């Protein structure tokens, strides 16, 4: 049960990455189709996914899954994997599964990407947190359901919310390193790259764009030749218009460069000619931007916050104290001057995320289970 593709999001490649891993492992699978609301592959309403498009695609997909279940094509020996826990029409699953014989009840795996358990998620910004938390509780009541969390810290949020279903940490987001690198085979050596710092997250308040703008202003006082670039897959927009107005003002002043409406390959080409990907998000779980930048040979500088110590395997040289401008600037100066000896390791690890999910779904990943008494014992351990 995949996600609809968006040009400005990693969902554009998600199904391809997943199918490559399934084929490599010899997994018998079927992609349940959905119908897109239009052919734009654009987010018109909302932030993370298009509000109408996600609903339309998800419900059409659920209709097809229900048809397969009614036809007897889905049994207790099967797994139904949802790329995203939020799936319009999901309530039909517990409604059906509570009424059919056990032989017609597959195991359900839901991958959670954020939602109401994250206090900085967009559902809180838009006042949707109450009904979303109730939706999450419903998902926990689906027969034979299991939850896939993207990292240890997200597991903690699920436990705080008293989720009752079995929880597994997949320690990463889905990623296909070979496919991504294949889009830009000729990547410049680090020393030949532009002195450019990229902000690749959404320009929304939970990503703290004000911190990035303040960093650019302060850093350029001593290093005026360094470029600070905002890269967006669509037009520059935000859930707080102030950030858009301020970014455009700073662009006119020469402090920022704004790259809008980028196609994937255009974005990757910019990464392959840049030195640092910078992140200052309050709300980010692993982040696809770190995998993409790392795969393109770009240094990554992220806050030592929430999931990032796990993602970076506790690498103190590429994480700064949140929210210390001084520490961020000191580490940025180093990472602009030379490549980290650990470039490539993050994307190698996240390249295995789909395999970890396959292991869990085929009964070979119990070491990743996190709903027991000692689920916090593994938090400080480097995963690679």
Regions found by a protein language model. Give the residues of each.
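Membrane-proximal helix-turn-helix segments that form the acceptor-binding/catalytic region
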Residues: 125-147
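Conserved donor-binding/catalytic core segment of Leloir-type glycosyltransferases
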Residues: 186-220, 229
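Glycosyltransferase donor-sugar binding loop
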Residues: 227-244, 260
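Aromatic "clamp/platform" in nucleotide-sugar-dependent glycosyltransferases that forms part
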Residues: 281-283
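Nucleotide-activated donor-binding/catalytic signature segment of Leloir-type glycosyltransferases, i.e.
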Residues: 241-265
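A charged, aromatic-enriched C-terminal amphipathic alpha-helix characteristic of glycosyltransferases
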Residues: 60, 323-326, 334-384
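N-terminal pre-catalytic "stem/leader" segment of glycosyltransferase-like enzymes
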Residues: 1-93
């Amino acid at each position: 049960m995949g996600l609809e593709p968006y040009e400005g999001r990693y969902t554009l490649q998600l199904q391809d990455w997943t199918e490559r891993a399934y084929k490599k492992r010899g997994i018998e699978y079927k992609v349940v189709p959905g119908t897109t609301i239009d052919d734009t592959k654009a987010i018109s309403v909302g932030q993370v996914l298009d509000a109408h498009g996600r609903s339309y695609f998800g419900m059409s997909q659920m209709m097809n899954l229900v048809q397969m279940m009614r036809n007897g094509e889905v049994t207790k020996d099967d797994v139904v994997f949802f790329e995203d826990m939020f799936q319009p029409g999901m309530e039909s699953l517990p409604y059906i599964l509570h009424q059919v014989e056990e032989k017609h009840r597959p195991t359900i795996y839901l991958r959670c990407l954020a939602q109401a358990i994250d206090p900085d998620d967009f559902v809180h910004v838009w006042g949707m947190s109450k009904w979303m938390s109730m939706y999450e509780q419903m998902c926990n009541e689906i027969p034979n359901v299991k939850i896939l969390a993207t990292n240890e810290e997200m597991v903690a949020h699920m436990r705080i919310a008293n989720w009752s279903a079995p929880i597994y940490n997949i320690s990463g987001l889905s990623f296909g390193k070979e496919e991504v690198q294949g889009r830009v085979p000729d990547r410049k050596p680090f020393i030949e790259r532009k002195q450019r710092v990229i902000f690749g997250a959404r320009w929304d308040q939970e990503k703290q764009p004000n911190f990035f703008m303040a960093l650019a202003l302060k850093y350029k006082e001593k290093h005026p030749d360094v470029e600070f670039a905002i890269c967006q897959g669509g037009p520059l927009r935000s859930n707080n218009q102030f950030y858009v107005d301020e970014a455009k003002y700073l662009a006119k002043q020469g402090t920022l460069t704004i790259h809008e409406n980028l196609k994937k390959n255009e974005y990757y080409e910019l990464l392959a000619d840049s030195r640092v990907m910078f992140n200052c998000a309050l709300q980010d779980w692993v982040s696809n931007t770190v995998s993409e930048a790392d795969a393109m040979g770009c240094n990554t500088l992220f806050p030592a916050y929430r999931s990032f110590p796990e993602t970076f395997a506790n690498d103190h040289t590429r994480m700064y104290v949140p929210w210390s401008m001084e520490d961020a600037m000191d580490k940025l100066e180093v990472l602009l001057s030379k490549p980290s000896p650990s470039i490539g390791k993050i994307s190698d690890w996240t390249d295995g995320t789909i395999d970890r999910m396959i292991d869990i779904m085929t009964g070979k990943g119990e070491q990743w289970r996190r709903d027991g008494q000692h689920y916090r014992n593994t938090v400080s351990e480097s995963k690679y």
